[in-house]
Structures are given as structure tokens and as C-alpha cells.
Amino acid sequence: PQTGENGSGWMYMYTDSLIRGFRQTHQPSPWINDYGTFSIMPVFGKLVTDNKSRGMSFRHENEKAAPDCYRVRFDNGVTTALSATSRGAVFEITYPSEEGQYIVVDAYQHGGSVAFDKEQNCIYGTTRYNNGGVPENFGNHFIVEFDKPVVEAGTDENSCAYVRFRLNAGETLTVHTASSFISHEQARLNLSREVDGRSLADVSAEAKRIWDEQMGRIKVEGGTEEQQKTFYSCLYRTLLFPREFYEFNEQEEPVYYSPYDGLVHNGYMYTDNGFWDTFRAVHPLFTLIYPEVSERIMQSVLNAYNESGFMPEWASPGHRGCMIGNNSISLLTDAWMKGIRTFDKDKALEAMVHQTQARSEEISSVGRDGYAEYDSLGYVPYPEVHEATAKTLEYAYADWCLARFAEATGHKDVADTYYQKAQNYRNLFYSEKGFMWANDSDGKWRENFDATEWGGPFTEGCSWHWTWSVFHDPEGLSSLLGSHKLMAARLDSMFVAPNTYNYGTYGFVIHEIAEMVALDMGQYAHGNQPIQHAIYLYNYVGEPWKAQYHTRNVMNRLYNSGPEGYCGDEDNGQTSAWYIFTALGFYPVCPGTSEYVLGSPLFPKVTISLPEGKTFVIDAEGVSDNNCYIRTAELNGVDFTRNYLKHDELLKGGEFRLLMDSVPNMERGINTEDFPYSYSTK
């Protein structure tokens, strides 16, 4: 359902009272907006095609939404229900009386076209709507079929088509639709395969089966009903992106229209994903729970490289100028280290190295912005390069990932080079202030240090948030901060420091600032990604019980199953995936290590279904709101003192038993051999 006007990134607002269309959307974010969009809208009474005027009022008590089906009864008595497949959908629509029964199909202008085919009793068209990241020949080709005779049809000047029916009051009109980015012929093939001749009930039942299988791979037991609703709502959101952009030809082979070179290729393509967000927890979740999806995504990343010269960092559907870093390298490395090795390792290494040594001329976020300065100075200088300190920290982590991959695939010379570059984070630690800060190209520290200043050398945050972005070497960060105890004290202070801010170069209070202030958790800003791993860093400095306390506190305070269930941007599933992992009791602080750092499990029992029929069971005896601390742990009956689990330990299956308590065990997980990976101690 679309409540916003065409072109608005806010396509469905819970506070809105009008629906303007039922939209085939590909939108991954309101900031990125949509592409390849068309909508289908019942209109009753007077014919109105314009999206600004055709909306019909509804109330939420007459609306029901589930992963497999959506239903609404409008205030004028029209009912609409729909269920979707991968590339199509089925609608059932009824009208309260016989006069003025219309369907409007909107191709969103932007050079789109629509027409009515009388012989086929269908509307077909092409929508070319986009907000960037597409070749010149881009189009989404669609077909909309009706099971009742059309008595009138027409089009308007705004790429809308309409049809009128004359049905009995309450009689069901069934609409079948499908689309293709390849051609109308492929759209027809998609329609015949996925929805042709199928009822709403058929499609809904199949959708429910698929969602049950996907979400059923993690079974939680116990906890409150609200906690279970929140958990599975987060899992649902995590599974929405990235989007399958491939189709199947007549031979049932995967093919796709490339949003990079505009040609049709064999193989897999995924899109609608910002790796700056999703490398942290979404893709690590796929490697563990949905490895077959992760395999195809890695192939897709390299397909994009072959077709454009760069791996994607933010794709929708092609390269978009958004965010920073080289986190495509993280995805490939993490997958490889976890045994997902169906992609070309030599091509992957070639693509990784190229990603660090070039930058797209058109889009600064594609490739490595400031790579020449980074290589010559050991950091990206500010103000010469926007967001330079954040980029330096991101590049250092990406270089570590590249080194890990090169080492694992037998390229020691490359590994040695990039392991050295992975230490560049040290070059922007301002020891006099104890925070990450900015240097110019002459090596001078930026004046007027302010750890609460947003923007400038940082991305959507301040030094309080970005100082922790040393995923691959918390031990090295600890040495910069002075000791394990001093790093733990700095983490403590993050939660109690005044939640003041300086909006800096942003010039106004961006929503991430407002969200941090509203959370009232000091300088901890869970509503945005850079700091979401920071709680788990207590495990690296011998105070794991604090990670257990704070992770539970964040889950309980900042998430719920309602319309306002997130404390900030959900961002392609990342904020949801944080909750999924954290509710299980562990989190992938550093993708590429194959380690999951412990927190506090939320449920008494969780069963994870794994490949080859294996299961990994997490038993948290005595867990409750008060009992958030780990007293003791056993892995397959053997005492377990480490602050992390290994990926291979999970994949083998088994049982992880935890005895939970209301008071912390300050003797568990305090020895350095129990700490997770850091490059400085490898």
C-alpha cells in the first residue's frame, strides 16, 4: 500500500489515512528512493487517475498485514487483498455497488508507457521511473490481467491507464500481474510461472509456506509474547534485502538484466543494499543461517565488478553515491572464511585490490575516495577529503579483510602489504585527547577538538562513536587508550556522558542526532550503525558482564513489535539483525574472523537449523529480565570460559548451555586467552 504521493520516499506512513495505490516497490530506503515502480489502484465512483487525488480513506482496524497477505477495507466499502510471489502478485477486489468500478494502473511518468490490450483483456506497460543508478535502456516491463470483462478502457497523459468493470455488488475481481526488467516476453513468462490461474488463497498459502520455512530456521522458545513478536518481526525485516534481481528463462536458467551495463547476462544479481550498514550483521547472519543465499550474493558482487569495473558498495539497482568504505571486501572475506567458496577467488582478489586503488569518476562512494592520500600519508586528510577520519577507519578494516582473504588464498605478499595498511587507524588517534580525530595533509591535528562534534571528518556521528571503529584490532585500540581498564572505563563513560552534541558541518540537527538525544543513553547512539558493536568490546578487555548488561538493556528499551519499534533507521535489516544476533546471545563484531562475541541471550531456548540437518541449541537456564548475567557456560558438556564462539563450532551442531544469574560473575572471561580475536595478538 502506498500512502504517499508518487515520488515520495515515505511510501507508507502509519499516520496517513489515504491509500493512493498498491505499488510494486523496489525501495530499499527513503533516502535512496524507488525505481522500476508501477501501482495498481481500485477507484470507485468518479474516475480519478491522478495519484494526488485518487486516494481512498481507510482505518487501521480495517487493515491486516502479514508476510503472506495484505487486506484492507476502505471507508467507501471497496475491499482489496493481495499476495505476492518473487516477480508477481494476485489481487482480489470487490466493490460495494455496480456503478463506477475502476482500476487505475500508474507507470509513474518518467518516460513510462501503458496501453490496454483488448484481446488479452490486460494492461501492459513499461515503467522507467528511477532515482539514479540505471543504464539508459532501463525499464521494468509489466502485465496486468483481469479475470472479468473490461467495459471501458483508456489512458491519460501521465502514463496512467484505466479500465472499468460492471460487476455485481460484492463480486470478486481477480487481478494477476507480473513484471520483468528484461522484456515483456519475460514478464509474460514470469506471470505464467508464478501467478497465472492461481487464486489469492493459492499464492498466499505458498507465500506463507516459504516465510515459515525461512523464519523457522531459528526457533525461539519462552520469553514473552512481545519478545517473540519483536524477534520474528526483526527476522522478517532482515530477510527483505538484498533483493533478487534475477529471473529464469525458458530453460529455467538464472538470467538478469544488468543495472551496470544494460545487458542481459546468465547468473545471479542482487541489489538494493548498502553494505556500509549490512556488512555488520545482515550478511554474517546469511552466512550462518542462509548460506545458499550468501553464495549467490557473493557471485553477484563479482558480476557487478565484471560489468562496471567496481564492486558495489551501495546498489539500487546499480551504483549509488551513498555512504563510505569498501565493505564489499568484508562480505567476500567473511563468506570465504566461513566456508562459502563457490565464487572465483582469483577474480575476487583482483576486484578487492582494484577497489582500494581506484575511485569512480562519477560516484565518490564507488571505489576508494582519497586512496592516493591514504597510501602516501597513512590516512585520509581533512579538510582535503570529506569524512576523512571515518574513511580512514573504514579503509583500515577493509585492508585487514583483504589481507585475511589474500592470506587464506595463498597470496602472502599481498597479505603482508594490507596487514600493514590495516594499522593505519593508529595514525588518527589523537593521544592528547584520547579520541580519533582529523589530520590535514601536513600532519597537523584539526583545531578546536570536540568529541561531540558531528560531521566534518566523521560520517553520521562524532568521535565518541567512531573511536570504536577498529573492528579488527580492539587490543590495538586498548593500547592506544592506555590499558584494558582504561578502555573499559571509556566504554562506561560513553553511557553516562551528557548526551550533548555539536551539529558541526551538518548545520542542523540531523535525525541521527535527535534520536541519540531521545534515547537518553549518554553518547551511545544505537539508532545508527557506527556504534552498534561497541557494547561487545567489553569482552576484549576482561569485563564481559558489562556487555551482558548493556545488550539486554538495549533490547528491552529500544525495540518493540509496534509501528515505532525501532529507535532509528532500520537500514536494510542491519538494526534488525543486531537484535536477532543479540537475542541469540552473540554478535559478529568483526566479520572476517569467523567469531561471534558473547552477550546475553534473551530466550530460555533457541534452536538454530543448520545445513546437513544439524542443529545448534542455546539453553539459557534461569534467564529473565533480572537474570541477564552468565554465571557458567558449557559447550557440548565441556566447561566454556571464552567470550566468543567460533563459526565452525556452531556449524558442527551441538548445545551451548548457560546458567544465568542476577549478579555478574566477575571471574569468568577475564583472562586474555578468553578474549576474541585482535590483530595485535594474533
Regions found by a protein language model. Name each.
Residues P1-S330, W336-L393, C401-N427, K433-M436, ...:
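Accessory carbohydrate-recognition regions in carbohydrate-active enzymes
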Residues A398:
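ATP-dependent phospho-/nucleotidyl transfer catalytic cores
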Residues Y629:
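Extracellular attachment/recognition segments
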